[in-house]
């Protein structure tokens, strides 16, 4: 089959020529530009189809950008029932909403905290870790709060029997109605979801969860300390409080 070359020729009027003649259309650009997939896919399309294709590409780009945006929900809401906080000196206060006064918070969630804590070996890993670098957290303008589903009486009992080396001002919230733990998804799935998971949760100044560090029997203390320090330091830099 012989191809008619005249089908690929277009009439072009030149400024210098006196007579118009048929010549092959050739476009030579002196500007180099990067070829894109979108240009290759839209080349040769009908204008209506090309417009629809571009609109679809723009819509897909917007969807991708929206998917990349991370939406953080506040951790604490107005509580339907007041909760009680055992402060660092053993006093009991009633609150309806956890105030966010510092740049960030380190929340220590406890399961069942009842037990004999007269010896350091029996103390939960949360308290051992936090007590070692509590001054460092304060230097980053970070406060520490414990949250447990235990009663106020049990909290006062185990705090009173802490070893002297681990005694520091750690306020502990008695979330006996499980409202805070349920809101943050920190209830243990076993046992009817009545006990809090053992974990350290770091939130920023507006109540957004930035890191969750679960506590297990095999958790390395040094690794846990490093993880908490790095996250808190990042929040301090983010808030402009540390260079």
UniProtKB/Swiss-Prot annotation:
Superkingdom per UniProt: Eukaryota
InterPro entries: AhpC/TSA (IPR000866), Thioredoxin-like_sf (IPR036249)
Subcellular location, principal: nucleus
Keyword presence, Transport: no
One Pfam family, short name: AhpC-TSA
GO CC, alphabetical: cytosol; nucleus
Compartments where located: Nucleus
KW Nucleus (keyword) present: yes
Keywords on record: Meiosis, Nucleus, Ubl conjugation pathway
GO annotation (BP), single: meiotic cell cycle
Record Gene3D superfamilies: Glutaredoxin (3.40.30.10)
Stretches the record annotates as Disordered: 28-50
An annotated Gene Ontology molecular function: thioredoxin peroxidase activity
Subunit structure: Homodimer. Interacts with but2 and uba3.
Known role: Acts as a negative regulator of the NEDD8 pathway. Has a role in meiosis.
Protein's name in the database: Uba3-binding protein but1
